[in-house]
Amino acid sequence: MSKYLIINADDFGYNPQQTKAIDELMRGKLITSTSLMTVAPDAANAAELARLGGYPVGVHLTINSDDSKNRWQSNSGAPSLSEKGMGLYESQVGLALHARRRDVRAELEAQYNFISSRGVEVDHAEIGRAHV
């Protein structure tokens, strides 16, 4: 059985700078996969780069926002995951107090569909930090 090392770059789509850096690393074959954060501002651009490059891509499951100034928006529009008019909860406590199981499930499915509907095959899922 052969062995190989997987080097995955996290947070593809987080912002234009990070998207560009990950794209360059993928094209240079310095990393072997990436995880796309579909609720982040540059997600659509990252998905298009992944499709064009044929990159191995996972979905970075995210149900809260890291950015307090520019709150990320839900892919599903699930009401219990967002503070009124502000986007996804920044606080894990706020999320835990309000999130409904069916909304969490709908959001995770919407994040998978965000990628797959753009012609990119999702080959793994990732959860990190406090996102899920």
Name these PLM-found stretches:
Residues 68-97:
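Active-site gating loops and adjacent loop-to-helix segments of metal-dependent hydrolytic enzymes
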Residues 16-41:
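A short alpha/beta connector and helix-capping loop motif
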Residues 1-16, 22:
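Boundary/entry segment of secreted carbohydrate-active catalytic domains
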Residues 4-6, 31-35, 54-60, 122-126:
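Structural preference for beta-strand elements that scaffold enzyme active sites
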Residues 102-127:
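CE4/NodB-like, metal-dependent polysaccharide N-deacetylase domain
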Residues 10-12, 37-39, 60-64, 128:
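Active-site beta-loop-alpha junctions enriched in small/polar residues
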Residues 130-132:
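Conserved small/polar residues in nucleotide/adenosyl-binding loops
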Residues 22-28, 44-56, 73-82, 117:
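Acidic (Asp/Glu)-rich catalytic clusters
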